[in-house]
């Protein structure tokens, strides 16, 4: 079935591809749009913007979220900003520079055409959000302000203090609410998609569980859009919201949609370190802090020991005895290297014994120099809410002492394979935002997730989905009484009944923690062949334990969070195995995927472009069967492929 990997990338010059492609897409006239139904799964920035835009175009949209309100989507937690090539700072930014730095940051493992389109529409996103009333930070004269993020040598990140995701989501939520009031969008809060329904090989609906009543419901449509985010919670401890999950995308994979580059997971360098065995999630400290914060560890082991024993404070260590290791190793970018580079550097220092907390798994993020240069008031203006959050969690005042940080799982670059139209290998099934694989390659640049979600939802999907729906408006509304719906619902009920009947000895959280330990130990920041094989073996054993000895309390026909978690863990166990399998197959180091066997003498990533310059798209072949690998070659016609260099 390799012929399914047709990317549909348009011919012609890079800068003209998207414009030319739009002109060649089929469209649906307003009268026919009213006959068509679209299901959108997820109400984060991608889902909310897509549902609002599609509703405004006149389609009948059903939008589903697992929370009480779309405002609870995890997009709201994004802190630092959103990238766009506006060149407001007059620092020589451009669409091409954003495109190039995104490709380079992803270690040359993403499609040129998709990334250029993302950079091309980025400016429109800012205009759209300003029109919605998003309160971006402004300079004294009223111009929108920018700051820098990792992997960029210009300032292109627009922000609303440390609450950018919240403000962008409120803008998208307002647009969504307007369409709900108009009647073009119907919202289904507290509903979780448990399966996608295919009729004649095309996506025609979903099976969902009402999380309040436990009722299993059927919903039909002419197309389905997956905007449910990534699968970072496979690791148990991550910066994601605790109910974030990859289940919707995973059900699509098991129905025939290919899953691409699952091993590409991003580990964020600035998170509050783990503090105990009973911790349920981790807290991100925005990358924006690296604009003014300097990362360091002591140079002397004796100072490290004294810090751990509480004999000295960080401020007692003299400037000449501090190792600002990112500034030392990467002088051209300093503390603003890409996330994968900064995370590995922190791990290297801690592995060498220079970690500064009692566990040895922390480094300092210090604002003393910035406070001396700018003053406390300016730092408070830029980062006040982030400093307040840090102090509440750690009881340490970051205005007076350095923050302690350590890398943690944050984002997944892998996801459902999609073509240039954002359609998966299943006709009528689309994936946007973090749910797809398309734009970030092996590593996402900071502030680009919000950019992709809104680009897909506002400015790409509303054009491309019409090309498919132009063939569907003559078809009647999907009959949810069709045998395919009956069969899908029956399978969902059987899975739930099986989980409820086990009555074993282990809670879902116990088993999820075990999975998280396996993933972090063997499929984390550093991977090797023996460890990945061990991970696959351990995950398979754990999956057997889960299906034979898990205990799911409560009633299936009612509100039951244990059942919700069990259904998601069943998927995480399978996702984790595919991640390990993909990482084992990809015998190179690129971006967030670091194989210890493939590194340079100074510990940097070492790609193998001859053998792995492709998207790895995996096809599900059945339970307990190995998936089949399909390859989409990556061609670079506008960028010269090179080893990433952030040193000069």
Outline where the language-model segments fall.
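Conserved N-terminal glycine-rich FAD pyrophosphate-binding loop of Rossmann-like flavoproteins
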Residues: 67-100, 266-270, 277-281
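Glycine-rich loop(s) and the adjacent beta-strand/alpha-helix scaffold that form part
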Residues: 223-278, 282, 440-463
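Core beta-strand elements of the Rossmann-like FAD/NAD(P) dinucleotide-binding domain
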Residues: 34-36, 214-223, 425
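Glycine- and aromatic-enriched mobile tails/lids
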Residues: 7, 20, 25-28, 32-37, ...
């Amino acid at each position: 079935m390799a012929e399914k990997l047709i990317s549909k990338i348009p011919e012609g010059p890079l800068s003209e591809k998207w414009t030319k492609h739009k002109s060649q897409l089929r469209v649906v006239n307003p009268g026919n749009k009213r006959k068509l139904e679209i299901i959108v799964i997820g109400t984060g920035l991608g889902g909310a913007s897509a549902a609002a835009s599609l509703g405004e175009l006149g389609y009948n949209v059903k939008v589903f979220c697992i929370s009480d309100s779309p405002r609870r989507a995890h997009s709201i937690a994004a802190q630092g900003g959103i990238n766009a090539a506006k060149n407001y700072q007059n620092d020589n930014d451009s669409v091409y520079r954003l495109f190039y730095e995104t490709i380079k940051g992803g270690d040359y493992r993403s499609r040129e055409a998709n990334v250029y389109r993302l950079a091309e529409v980025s400016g429109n996103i800012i205009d759209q959000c300003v029109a919605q009333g998003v309160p971006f930070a402004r300079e004294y004269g009223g111009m929108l302000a920018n700051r820098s993020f990792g992997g960029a040598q210009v300032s292109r990140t627009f922000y609303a203090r440390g609450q950018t995701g919240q403000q962008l989501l409120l803008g998208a939520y307002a647009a969504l609410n307007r369409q709900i009031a108009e009647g073009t969008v119907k919202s289904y809060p507290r509903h979780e998609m448990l399966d996608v329904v295919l009729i004649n090989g095309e996506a025609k609906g979903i099976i969902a569980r009402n999380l309040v009543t436990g009722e299993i419901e059927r919903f039909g449509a002419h197309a389905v859009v997956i905007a449910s985010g990534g699968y970072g919670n496979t690791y148990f401890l991550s910066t994601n919201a605790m109910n974030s999950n990859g289940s919707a995308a995973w059900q699509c994979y098991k129905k025939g949609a290919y899953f691409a580059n699952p091993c590409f997971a991003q580990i964020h360098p600035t998170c509050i370190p783990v503090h105990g065995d009973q911790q349920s999630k981790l807290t991100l400290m925005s990358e924006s802090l690296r604009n003014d914060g300097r990362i360091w560890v002591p140079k002397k082991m004796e100072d490290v020991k004294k810090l751990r024993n509480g004999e000295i404070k960080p401020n007692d260590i003299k400037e000449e005895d501090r190792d600002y290791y990112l500034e030392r190793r990467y002088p051209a970018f300093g503390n603003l290297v890409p996330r994968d580079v900064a995370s590995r550097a922190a791990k290297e220092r801690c592995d060498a014994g220079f970690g500064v907390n009692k566990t040895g798994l922390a480094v300092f993020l210090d604002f003393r120099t910035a406070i001396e240069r700018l003053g406390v008031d300016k730092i408070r203006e830029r980062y006040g809410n982030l400093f307040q959050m840090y102090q509440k969690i750690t009881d340490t005042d970051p205005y007076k002492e350095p923050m302690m940080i350590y890398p943690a799982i944050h984002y997944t670059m892998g996801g459902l394979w999609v073509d240039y139209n954002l359609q998966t290998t299943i006709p009528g099934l689309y994936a946007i935002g973090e749910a797809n694989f398309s734009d970030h390659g092996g590593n996402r640049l900071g502030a680009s997730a919000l950019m992709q979600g809104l680009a897909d939802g506002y400015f790409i999907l509303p054009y491309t989905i019409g090309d498919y729906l132009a063939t569907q408006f003559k078809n009647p509304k999907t009959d949810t009484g069709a045998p395919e719906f009956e069969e899908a619902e029956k399978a969902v009920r059987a899975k739930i009944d099986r989980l409820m009947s086990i009555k074993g000895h282990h809670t879902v959280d116990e088993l999820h923690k075990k999975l998280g330990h396996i993933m972090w130990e063997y499929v984390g920041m550093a991977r090797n062949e023996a460890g990945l094989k061990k991970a696959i073996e351990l995950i398979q054993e754990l999956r057997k334990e889960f299906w034979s000895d898990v205990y799911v309390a409560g009633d299936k026909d009612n509100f039951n969070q244990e059942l919700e978690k069990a259904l998601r863990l069943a998927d995480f166990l399978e996702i984790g195995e595919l991640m390990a399998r993909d990482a084992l197959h990809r015998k190179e180091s690129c971006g967030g995927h670091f194989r210890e066997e493939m590194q340079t003498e100074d510990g940097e990533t070492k790609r193998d472009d001859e053998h792995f310059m492709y998207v790895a798209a995996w096809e599900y072949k059945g339970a307990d069967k190995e998936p089949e690998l399909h390859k989409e070659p990556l061609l670079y016609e506008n960028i010269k492929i090179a080893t990433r260099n952030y040193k000069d």
